[in-house]
Amino acid sequence: MTFYTQTKPADQLKLEVVAAVVTDAMRWDIDRWDRSRWDREEVPAGTLIFNAGMWNREKWIEETALTKWVDITGPCTHISVKRGVTTAGSIMYAHTGTLSVKAAAELDPRAAGILYGAQIRLKNTRNGQPIFTGFITDIKVEPGKKASDTAVTIEAADTVAKVASITRYGARPDGGRLENWESRVRRLMGSAPNVAYEIPSTSYALVCPTVWETSLAAHLDAATATVGGAWYCDRQGTLQICAYPPQQYKTNVALTDSYERTGKIDTWHYTDAKATWQAENIVSRVEATVHDAAPNDSGEWRAADYVAVAVEPTRATAWGGSTLKIDTLAPSRFIADEMAQTMLKEALDYPTVSAVAFWPVSQRIDNDQRQDRMNTAGLIDPLDLVEVIRDGDKSLAHITSVSHDITPYTWKTTLTLLPKEVIGFENLFTGPNSTR
């Protein structure tokens, strides 16, 4: 058995888009409805005549033409996916997930009915699970010297991009000043009625009113930052808005730099790890901007922002360091000050494994392992908890982003990580009666 006949991504993955149902009916500016063949004052032989012959209205596509999921995997030569969050210290911000497809000339987007904004998904046919779900943001066709040299590129984004495009003009409860964290999240999501979302973990925290005019994504970032949580788009295209990251293993994965077994169901031997340390990256100052609001003398709500500052003089003197700036909705100055101090304490001054890469499929992976490895890799989500082993030392980390680089014959996955111990503000919001 050669490498090219062994189990490979092309056997297991399917890329699909929602496209118009292709029939033998006439389609705008294509084939029989090509504008160059329209009626003219002098009608040459073979010209289309309205409601006659090939232009008979009975053969037109109706305005309510159906669409369906269409498989476009065949011509694809490279697929890359990236989903997850970005980090600033211990704070996580949602990042738009992307899918990029490169394909050969056999994929003609116009002929296939593929349009800007159409839904697109990459899924694993073995377990039926999606790896990415989103919508097309760009289609590019680059003609070559020969027709067969034409290159097609399709770009797509996930639901985070839609949320980032929505402007939200503040948020406050119907009565009173503070409101429950989950109530605020649901209030914010009222600005995106067609976006599916879930709240897998909630918080007892209260948040302040705000008149902050910014994107809905920035409001969600501030809400989750206030409780040490995060939000992201999952593989099905649904937003997951979490007060805190998962505390249990989902995929039972261990990432190790050795070839020893770890006791985990899936032991991934990573081939490349990033664990760098630079003095200028040490956080020596935290500035937490609270986007508060209060009524003026006329009863109109106005911005009452303030900044909570925490400084570590020893770090600043020894290393110089950097300033971490975040947006929050803390309910009081006391909580804001405590948050800033907590983030400063959580800032690491030692190197940790921040990224690893491994291969579900390559020439070095045994054929009988490939299907299971592809199944597991495709299920990885941001915030998943994993065990990381480096030079014999074990630690727990949350995945902050997952990237897949896939060809018909190979699959490389890269994960970025954040140590578990630097996440969360459990000490600030302790119960439903907490008033701090």
Q: What are the functions of these language-model segments?
A:
Residues 2-16, 34, 44, 87-88, ...:
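Surface-exposed cap/loop segments at beta↔alpha junctions
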Residues 56-57, 61-66, 70-73, 80-92, ...:
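N-terminal assembly/attachment segments of tailed bacteriophage virion structural proteins
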Residues 69, 130-135, 153, 323, ...:
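Well-ordered beta-strand positions in beta-sheet-rich domains
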Residues 77-89, 137-145, 400-406:
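Short amphipathic beta-strand and strand-loop transition segments with alternating hydrophobic
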